[in-house]
Swiss-Prot record:
GO terms for molecular function: large ribosomal subunit rRNA binding; structural constituent of ribosome. The keyword Iron does not apply. Belongs to the universal ribosomal protein uL14 family. Part of the 50S ribosomal subunit. Forms a cluster with proteins L3 and L24e, part of which may contact the 16S rRNA in 2 intersubunit bridges. CDD domains: Ribosomal_uL14. The lineage of its organism: Archaea, Methanobacteriati, Methanobacteriota, Methanomada group, Methanobacteria. PANTHER family: 50S/60S RIBOSOMAL PROTEIN L14/L23, LARGE RIBOSOMAL SUBUNIT PROTEIN UL14. HAMAP family: Ribosomal_uL14. One of its GO terms (biological process) is translation. This is Large ribosomal subunit protein uL14. It comes from Methanothermobacter thermautotrophicus (strain ATCC 29096 / DSM 1053 / JCM 10044 / NBRC 100330 / Delta H).
Length: 132
């Protein structure tokens, strides 16, 4: 995992549902915690593009449902600003399933991937077909 230059808005709190855009068998996942989040008392942990989260699989194949896994967020609807002044937002909130070390579990990623996620997680960047 590498550091990223831009400060991404943390728009996805615990409980948010995301589309799973890889070929692991999970279709929809729910965030149950954010890795490395240091917050304030009674504040819900929130995540943004490029963050690793712990998710529960809500929809998918029978053997994947109700599994607790790690995922990396690759798209979010809430816009965020890059250091060059460009504002980026996507059509949906999406994540890909990864191992605890950050290695992609699937072999393909559907749709575009944010540059911040691809730079921070090399295995996600190498599997992405489109990097925005």
């Amino acid at each position: 995992m590498k550091a990223i230059a831009s400060k991404v808005t943390r728009a996805l709190p615990v409980g948010a549902r995301l589309q799973c855009v890889d070929n692991t068998g999970a279709r929809e996942v729910e965030i149950i915690s954010v890795r490395g989040y240091k917050g304030v008392r009674r504040r819900l942990a929130a995540a943004g593009v490029g963050d690793m989260v712990v998710v529960s699989v809500k929809k998918g194949t029978v053997d994947m449902r109700r599994e607790v896994l790690n995922a990396v967020i690759v798209r979010q609807k809430k816009e965020y600003r890059r250091p060059d002044g460009l504002r980026v937002k996507f059509e949906d909130n999406a994540a890909v399933i990864v191992s605890p070390e950050g290695v992609l579990k699937g072999s393909e990623i559907r749709g575009p991937v944010a540059k911040e996620a691809a730079d921070r997680w090399p295995s996600v960047g190498s599997a992405a077909s489109i990097i925005v």
